[in-house]
Amino acid sequence: MKYILLGLLLMVVLANANRLADPNCGVCTLRSICFMEKESCPKGFKCCAFKRQDKPGSKITRGCCVKNKN
């Protein structure tokens, strides 16, 4: 039961991440959640920050890994 609830929560988080992803970073593939203060994306990817529309002055700490545009 615990894993079902965690799966549902992850789906909600990923759906919101896609909606709030920064358009300047390209398409958010949502393969992994990254943290802005750590290098948590694989090589060839960068951490693209979520836009926080609910709290305009809030500090952005999370994002999603997107492929570098080269």
UniProtKB/Swiss-Prot annotation:
One of its GO terms (molecular function) is toxin activity. It is found in: Secreted. One of its GO terms (cellular component) is extracellular region. Its main location: secreted. Expressed by the venom gland. Keywords: Disulfide bond, Secreted, Signal, Toxin. Contains 4 disulfide bonds. Residues 1-17 form the signal peptide. The keyword Disulfide bond applies. The keyword Nuclease does not apply. Belongs to the scutigerotoxin-02 family. This is U-scutigerotoxin(02)-Tl1a.
